[in-house]
UniProtKB/Swiss-Prot annotation:
One of its GO terms (biological process) is translation. HAMAP family: Ribosomal_uS19. The gene is rpsS. It comes from the Bacteria. GO terms for cellular component: cytoplasm; small ribosomal subunit. One of its GO terms (molecular function) is rRNA binding. This is Small ribosomal subunit protein uS19.
Length: 93
């Protein structure tokens, strides 16, 4: 279920404040964020945001294609190592 249109997109207030301050000063620093639910706004394009994945901060460089998506979509929380090739099960069949 998507968010109600009358509420508008969610973004952490501190993150938005930091982005606006950096845009005024023309700075491009890495911003550490724990708010994976924040929506990516057009003001964030060109910035690198370090999104927390539960263990560490994963650097995410924001491009135009990412606008409207959530920050958490680009920092995976689970490591997929693939399925094991178990030779015993394949020989039985």
């Amino acid at each position: 279920m998507s968010r109600s249109a009358k509420k508008g997109p969610f973004i952490h207030k501190g993150l938005l404040r930091k982005i606006e301050e950096m845009n005024e000063k023309d700075e491009k620093k890495v911003i550490k964020v724990w708010s994976r639910a924040s929506t990516i706004f057009p003001q964030m394009i060109g910035h690198t945001i370090a999104v927390h994945d539960g263990r560490k901060h994963v650097p995410v460089y924001v491009t135009e294609d990412m606008v409207g998506h959530k920050l958490g979509e680009f920092a995976l929380t689970r490591t997929y190592r693939g399925h094991d090739d178990d030779e015993k099960t394949s020989k039985r069949k």
